[in-house]
UniProtKB/Swiss-Prot annotation:
GTP binds at residues 29-35, 71-75, 130-133. Disulfide bonds: none annotated. Belongs to the small GTPase superfamily. Arf family. GO terms for molecular function: alpha-tubulin binding; beta-tubulin binding; GTP binding; GTPase activity. Keywords: Cell cycle, Cell division, Cell projection, Chromosome partition, Cytoplasm, Cytoskeleton, Endosome, GTP-binding, Lysosome, Membrane, Mitosis, Nucleotide-binding, Protein transport, Synapse, Transport. Residues 1-19 dip into the membrane without crossing it. Ubiquitously expressed. Plays a role in lysosome motility. In neurons, mediates the anterograde axonal long-range transport of presynaptic lysosome-related vesicles required for presynaptic biogenesis and synaptic function. May play a role in chromosome segregation. Pfam families: Arf. The lineage of its organism: Eukaryota, Metazoa, Chordata, Craniata, Vertebrata. One of its GO terms (cellular component) is ficolin-1-rich granule membrane. Interacts with PLEKHM1. When GTP-bound, interacts with RUFY3 and RUFY4, but not with RUFY1, nor RUFY2. It comes from Homo sapiens. This is ADP-ribosylation factor-like protein 8A.
Length: 186
């Protein structure tokens, strides 16, 4: 009965109130961050992406939720900016190229260094292993192990294996983020 009431209340709120969430998307260069933003925004995959220089900000509306998405460059010279753009957001989305196993160790180190920053304590993290359509790509279980995600105890953390190219698991990623946005405000 309570679950039914909560669903009815959510539906009623959706009629009258727009929800907003702010996300920061970080990860090493060529992991698919900008592609992810474009797939969410337009449903289109573009093979010819140019690496992000600095950052891009995009607002995307899905249903009654407006998502303000900060897409931060992944080259070494931009990584010092990650912390600043991650402060106070609803969630941090950390993109990993799951098919490039040579960069997994560096990706793990960058993630853990970022999450060690005191200003980011408690902010939830969604780790996305992109490019699951490529041969040799790590699955969720392997990503959790190689990225040492089980060591992250001070916040909510979730991991999905996705393919921006094939649009695999993009919908559940959005559902998690939107649901998470609702639970953070409750």
């Amino acid at each position: 009965m309570i679950a039914l009431f909560n669903k009815l209340l959510d539906w009623f709120k959706a009629l009258f109130w727009k929800e907003e969430m702010e996300l920061t998307l970080v990860g090493l260069q060529y992991s698919g961050k900008t592609t992810f933003v474009n797939v969410i925004a337009s449903g289109q995959f573009n093979e010819d992406m140019i690496p992000t220089v600095g950052f891009n900000m995009r607002k995307i509306t899905k249903g009654n939720v407006t998502i303000k998405l900060w897409d931060i460059g992944g080259q070494p010279r931009f990584r010092s900016m990650w912390e600043r753009y991650c402060r106070g957001v609803s969630a941090i989305v950390y993109m990993v190229d799951a098919a490039d196993q040579e960069k997994i160790e560096a990706s793990k180190n960058e993630l853990h260094n970022l999450l060690d920053k005191p200003q980011l304590q408690g902010i939830p993290v969604l780790v996305l292993g992109n490019k699951r359509d490529l041969p040799g790509a790590l699955d969720e279980k392997e990503l959790i192990e190689k990225m040492n995600l089980s060591a992250i105890q001070d916040r909510e953390i979730c991991c999905y294996s996705i393919s921006c190219k094939e649009k695999d698991n993009i919908d559940i990623t959005l559902q998690w983020l939107i649901q998470h946005s609702k639970s953070r405000r409750s």
